[in-house]
């Protein structure tokens, strides 16, 4: 057993993860072929999460926040509570309404649009709450009161004065959210039947292809 473990570590140092029991191909080659799809989905999901998170955060600190705050807080809470698998099924049903299964619109949305939207929506809630907390702290700063005294309108005050100081905690959160999004690709790729490391992991476990599953986990 120790000899086998030593051989495994030696192969791991050479990026030799063995061969697939199902196809006979090297595991490293199989993983390398699927990795670009997962990276593309994770980056697109991160962009969606940032856009939605900042939008919800800005809406929650508007002058008329009595109307926008409940909506923004509700959407952020829903994003944090709704499972990716459930929101993915809802997104598929919505995508089918936009066009027949073979239309170009439906193919585009199923290819990257809907998976990225579902994946990014699951992370936008935490970003929105952090943006709102940072901007509320910044809005109470003396320089914001000075900008208001100079007659700067609320919209420009939010964008040019309050948003930039509130970016620091969000930037530190991006690394955590990126790791979360990579983990979320397992469910997203499986729900949307999209190629990638997540779908490869699920299929290798179901097929009993343990070298591939082991290589993905490592």
Task: Please tell me what each predicted stretch does.
Residues 7-10, 74-103, 118-123, 129:
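Membrane-water interface segments at the C-terminal ends of transmembrane alpha-helices
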Residues 31, 35-68, 84, 104-218:
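Alpha-helical transmembrane segments of integral membrane proteins
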Residues 1-54:
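An internal, D/E-rich "acidic patch" concept
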